[in-house]
Amino acid sequence: MSKKFEDFNNPREKALQGMKDSIPASQWEENLQFLKKLRNKIAQLPVSKHPAIEILNNGYLDKQTLTRIHLEYRHAIVQIFTDALLKAQFLTKQLEPKLHSGAKMFPRVLLSLNILDEFGFRPGLDKDNYYLGNPEYAHYPLYEDLLNDYGLTEADRRNYKPSKIADQVRTFLEASYDSYINVVALLAVAEEEVI
């Protein structure tokens, strides 16, 4: 059946529908229930209710402490977040033996939308009828701009010695790069905790 290339609206919804249609309805429902339980479990983790969250939200920390927190987070997550997203996009190939041919494209589209946002793109067209985007508005450079606002130099960043736990978080995420399921699960947890 030939396709008419006319409908480019709602790519996120189309990708989700394509993913849903690529597996039996019972498996989709089972996955939704698993996701609901996982979110509830994450919400119950001590890190989700840690007193530090309230302290951060209420602005009770001094500049030195905030600077250290931002450098820790930079090392643990920020520097490698898009690496993990791109790896997840590549690893969708692991789905193909279990699904119909081409089904890996649906999660790739969803990941692409996230990647575009991370890379500084916005919905819409620019003055030349091309994609709206600017790499300087990518999340990683914006994070580096925040560190600039804290007065940190490039040398400060390069010479920073992260804590053992920040290093372990980074190593754990990087160790997931060979498994689509692992890297996507860790990215989801990271997104959930940041939000």
Language-model features: locations:
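Non-heme di-metal
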Residues: S2-I195
